[in-house]
């Protein structure tokens, strides 16, 4: 557990039908690390206001506000009741990326959770919001398969760009791994000379490491390995010394 204060877990939701899976998994993670959960949704203003008349536009915003509030509260309430954990739902209208950036700066979460979109081709960072968050948020990011089961014991965990020794600031990773399926899949992109000398993280048990040389298709290859090994929860751990390949994901 984090010293003094609870971990702040921020779940970014698009309120699609499978959003409940992402939120359920996030709340289970929060329970393991004794964290608190914020649920955040942004609706494009252009999707709400389509009338040129000011009065009609204001009425449309008000109607959408009530509808989104009801939907968000329903989602948070249903998961909160099942998992017995408080979820704070918040939403806003405007530019999606700007609103997310502002919310992150204001609330200062420790962990940001996003759902990984379904795709015919495996895509590690296919959604435009994911690379944006990776660029703007320097904390730790959880990418959760939207098809995942909410029970953390049934999860298959992957680590991307993890350091050789997961430090104490990342102790929540150890808590989650302890409840997940084994082995953990660790993915890293590195120079050939570095890759030849690297091995498994000695602080983690039952880790299968995949080290790829730097090249244009490295992330695509990792994505294929994720799909093959059915990894449905990926930890993206960034440090100040993060390599150009990792920061280049954005």
Label the model's feature ranges:
Residues 91-99, 217-218:
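Charged docking surfaces used in two-component/phosphorelay signaling
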Residues 48, 220-221, 242-246:
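Short active-site-adjacent structural elements
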Residues 215-227:
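A short, acidic, amphipathic alpha-helical segment used as a generic capping/interface helix at domain edges
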Residues 5, 99-149, 226-250:
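Gly/Ser-rich helix-loop-strand patches that form or flank binding pockets
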Residues 81-88, 203-209:
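A short helix-to-beta-strand connector/capping loop
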Residues 2-56, 154-212, 231-233:
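Small/aliphatic-rich secondary-structure junction motif
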Residues 75-76, 129, 195-205, 246-250:
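Short, aromatic/basic amphipathic alpha-helical patches
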Residues 57-70:
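A short acidic, glycine-rich active-site loop
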């Amino acid at each position: 557990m984090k010293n003094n204060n609870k971990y702040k877990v921020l779940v970014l939701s698009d309120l699609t039908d499978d959003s409940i899976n992402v939120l359920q998994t996030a709340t289970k993670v929060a329970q393991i690390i004794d964290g608190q959960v914020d649920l955040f949704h942004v609706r494009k203003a252009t999707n709400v206001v389509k009338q040129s008349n000011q009065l009609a536009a204001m009425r449309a915003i008000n109607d959408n506000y009530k509808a989104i509030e009801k939907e968000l509260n329903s989602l948070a309430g249903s998961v909160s009741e099942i998992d017995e954990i408080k979820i704070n739902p918040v939403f806003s209208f405007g530019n999606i990326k700007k609103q997310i950036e502002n919310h992150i700066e204001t609330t200062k979460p420790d962990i940001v959770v996003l759902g990984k979109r379904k795709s015919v081709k495996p895509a590690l960072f296919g959604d435009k919001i994911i690379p944006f968050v990776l660029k703007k948020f320097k904390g730790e990011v959880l990418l959760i398969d939207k098809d995942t089961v909410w029970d953390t014991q049934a999860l298959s965990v992957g680590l991307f760009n993890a350091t050789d020794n997961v430090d104490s600031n990342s102790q929540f990773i150890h808590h989650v791994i302890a409840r997940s399926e084994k082995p953990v899949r660790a993915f890293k992109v590195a120079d050939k000379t570095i890759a030849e000398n690297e091995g498994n993280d000695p602080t983690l048990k039952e880790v299968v490491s995949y080290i790829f040389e730097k090249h244009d298709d490295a992330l695509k290859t990792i994505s294929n390995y994720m799909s093959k090994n059915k990894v449905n929860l990926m930890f993206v751990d960034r440090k100040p010394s993060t390599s150009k390949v990792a920061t280049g994901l954005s």
